[in-house]
Swiss-Prot record:
One GO cellular component, as annotated: photosystem II
UniProt protein name: Photosystem II reaction center protein X
Gene3D superfamilies: Single helix bin
Main location group: membrane
Organism, as annotated: Nostoc sp. (strain PCC 7120 / SAG 25.82 / UTEX 2576)
Ranges that cross the membrane: 10-30
Quaternary structure, from the entry: PSII is composed of 1 copy each of membrane proteins PsbA, PsbB, PsbC, PsbD, PsbE, PsbF, PsbH, PsbI, PsbJ, PsbK, PsbL, PsbM, PsbT, PsbX, PsbY, PsbZ, Psb30/Ycf12, peripheral proteins PsbO, CyanoQ (PsbQ), PsbU, PsbV and a large number of cofactors. It forms dimeric complexes.
UniProt entry keywords in alphabetical sequence: Membrane, Photosynthesis, Photosystem II, Thylakoid, Transmembrane, Transmembrane helix
GO biological process: photosynthesis
Keyword flag Transmembrane: yes
Free-text function comment from the UniProt entry: Involved in the binding and/or turnover of quinones at the Q(B) site of photosystem II (PSII). PSII is a light-driven water plastoquinone oxidoreductase, using light energy to abstract electrons from H(2)O, generating a proton gradient subsequently used for ATP formation.
Membrane protein topology class: Single-pass membrane protein
Gene from which this protein is expressed: psbX
Amino acid sequence: MTPSLSNFLWSLAWGTLIVVIPATVGLIFISQKDKIQRS
């Protein structure tokens, strides 16, 4: 694997982590909050 390809894959992986993790945490937080409001 060439260094540029390796860097590209790493940047994709980090980009995914940076987007997916906060989105997941946000969804969990919102769903928990929503549950509390309904009950």
